[in-house]
Amino acid sequence: DPLKLCLNVENLFVALKGGVSTNGFVSGDFLKALGKDGIVINISRGSVIDENSLLDALENNILSGAGLDVFENEPKINNRFFELNNVFMQPHQASATIKTRKEMGELQFQNILNYFETGSPLTLVPELN
């Protein structure tokens, strides 16, 4: 039970896939369970944390801090985050390893090449399908 887990840890490292099944997964109840010494680190998708609950918890000292690489409405980050001194924010770069960046560049190249050869990229964005 993830909520029970939060009662027994101080740091929650979030690395979930995005989508309907994980939208708001880290709720206000999770944050309260972490307690005043709790820290949330999110490197997955901004949608997996209930951002308003996170902001309320940080502003009201229900939670000690947060490290965020992603936000719910990127690139429009909620201005309330900028008023807090208990949040570390970075610009969506948790995947920034040399190996990953090389693979991303190669995939982009293969997508363009495949598009011109077949009329469709290798990794079609579902919304454009």
Tell where the protein language model's regions lie, with residue ranges.
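C-terminal helix-to-coil terminal segments
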Residues: 74-129
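Rossmann-like adenosine-cofactor binding region
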Residues: 1-80
